[in-house]
Amino acid sequence: MVQVPRRKIAQLSAALTALVSMPALAHPGMHHIAGFASGFAHPLAGWDHLLAMLAVGLWASQQRRTMAVALPLAFPLVMVLGALAAAAGYALPAAETGIAASVLVLGLLVAFAVKMPAWGGLPVVALFAAAHGYAHGMEVPAGSALATYGAGFVVATVMLHLAGLVAGHLIQVRSAGNAVRALGASMAAGGVYLLAAI
């Protein structure tokens, strides 16, 4: 179980939020605010996105310190690349299947408390992040800039990662990790449902 100081979590959260919020703040106007709000709401409005983002944080809480930091950073970074690919007109076959599969796989990784080195864990997260980012990029509202919309969904994603990371850490302190693994199993079951519904 990773022991991440609360001060470090707060600093990381503040830095990431400030970084991804800069594009939205640089262009004042109602359409930019609406774009940011729409992007922020997108990961929160769908169970597939919501569960996957939380699962990344929960899985990070089960890793050693380097991976505990790397996973929540890698996901939003690759997600942005996926959104840019969508905006540029590139096709990503079976993106929705990849998103549903991410809930199943990430849930299983949490359920079995799988520990991976960076060379194994980061590609897994990156693959699923690209699918989530592509879906976000395909949903940019008319009249909204990709930068402000993207800032919104990145902020929401980082918040969900941090929520999963902190919750996972606190739960493991109190229940020796069994409750976190149970959450992972529930998420995996949700992933099966999402895959069956496609």
Protein language model regions, located:
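Membrane metalloprotein/metal-transporter helix-bundle signature
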Residues: V2-I198
